[in-house]
Amino acid sequence: MNKQDTTLLSANGYSLSLSVFPAQKAKANIMFVHGMEEYKERYIAFASFLQEHGYNVITSDLRGHGKDAPQLSHIADKYGDKLIIQDQQAITKYIETTFPDLPLYIFAHSMGTIITRVLLQNDSKKYQKVALSGYVNPNPASGVGLGLTRLIKVFKKPTGHSKLINDLAVGQFGKAIKDRKTELDWLSYNEDNVNKYIEDPLCGVEFTLASFEALFSLLNQMGKAKSYKDVNKEMPILLIAGDADPCTGLEKGRKASLDNLHKAGFNDVSTITLEHMRHEILNEDNKQKVYEDILEFFDK
């Protein structure tokens, strides 16, 4: 494995932490966008796998995430939704400059799929393929969550926390798992993965109110199919998730995500629903099948 770490100055002077996995004879670039309350090093194994199969992979920590974050799980005091999109635009430009004349793909997971879909609303023609893992479903109630978060933030400040908002955003996922041993069993059937996440000081740190404001704002924007402009209609998009992933909204939510992209104008959207898998499909016991499914999508 060849991995090079670097930093990139983004909007409002924020320093983004990047890892670059250059392939010997690259056929395309793949930009990773990770999920909420985790960090880029959790994707080293999958990034290395894609690197070995001929892809330059670029991973990064979302602002407020990872070991270099000024304050863990705090995206920004304000405008976090806009800043996090500007970060991905800056990374896109970095990749285009560093590895020119190659197709650019995206692999995104969880909250990263929300960010990616908002990114595509204005920039879809910059990318040639997109794979969305553990994709969050459009939720009409996101506007209510956004309003409530903003109200509580007035009294508790941007860096404050709220159990009510945390429960509203992610609390239902744990409750969806019967006979659960922990509140994070929804992450995977793989208990070792769940325990590692719980024990990792860089994982599961509760979002601040300003971060939840950014999350709800992005989720609200993601659901607006009419917000997609100058759509790259024939760009292949893969929606891949575990059949028992509550984050997708299960069967009804998965259909809502598919319908939303079709309404936005994307004609080539495929789905893979994996049996006996939950949210973190890359960390389930049968992760090799997931690796191969995503590789096949990028290769074809």
What is the predicted function of each stretch?
Residues 1-25:
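N-terminal cap/lid segment of alpha/beta-hydrolase-fold proteins
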Residues 78-97:
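Alpha/beta-hydrolase active-site loop
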Residues 27, 34-38, 110-111, 243-244:
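Active-site glycine-rich loops that stabilize anionic/oxyanionic intermediates
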Residues 262-300:
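Catalytic active-site module of serine/aspartate enzymes centered on a nucleophile-bearing elbow/loop
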Residues 116-202:
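Alpha/beta-hydrolase-fold enzymes
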Residues 42-72:
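Conserved alpha/beta-hydrolase
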Residues 99-110:
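Alpha/beta-hydrolase fold nucleophile elbow
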Residues 239-241:
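Short beta-strand/loop motif that positions the catalytic acidic residue
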